[in-house]
């Protein structure tokens, strides 16, 4: 088994980028950008399995805005809704709240036998 590691000391387009990797895979997460997984790379093939929007660079969104105007690619958390909706008098944005909010994070285990990154966010609208 190859060594695993977490490197929290990267920045990409002025966003913190936390890189998790082992001998086979590399993932890049933006905690400030809804814990977006921006890269998921098979290292042997140098193949990123996540699409990047050629027209939009990663940037901090404004809460409640249209997801499509901010989507730079990658893999986003879209809890708790898929469309704009109202529940118990509260209006939820398109594709939810979590994609546009900064998440707290900590490295639980930095490697080399195991690497574990813990990310957490409380919603603003949803109970």
Can you say where each PLM-predicted feature lies in the sequence?
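Surface-exposed acidic/polar loop and edge beta-strand patches at domain peripheries
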Residues: 1-127
């Amino acid at each position: 088994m190859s060594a695993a590691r977490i490197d929290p000391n990267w920045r990409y387009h002025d966003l913190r980028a936390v890189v998790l990797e082992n001998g086979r895979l590399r993932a890049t997460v933006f905690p400030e950008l809804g814990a977006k997984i921006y890269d998921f790379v098979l290292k042997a093939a140098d193949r990123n399995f996540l699409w990047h929007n050629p027209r939009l660079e990663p940037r901090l969104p404004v809460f409640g805005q249209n997801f499509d105007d901010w989507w730079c690619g990658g893999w986003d958390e879209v809890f708790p809704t898929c469309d704009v909706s109202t529940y118990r008098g509260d209006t939820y944005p398109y594709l939810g709240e979590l994609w546009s909010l900064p998440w707290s994070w900590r490295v639980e285990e930095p490697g080399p036998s195991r690497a574990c990154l813990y990310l957490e966010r409380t919603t603003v609208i949803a109970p």
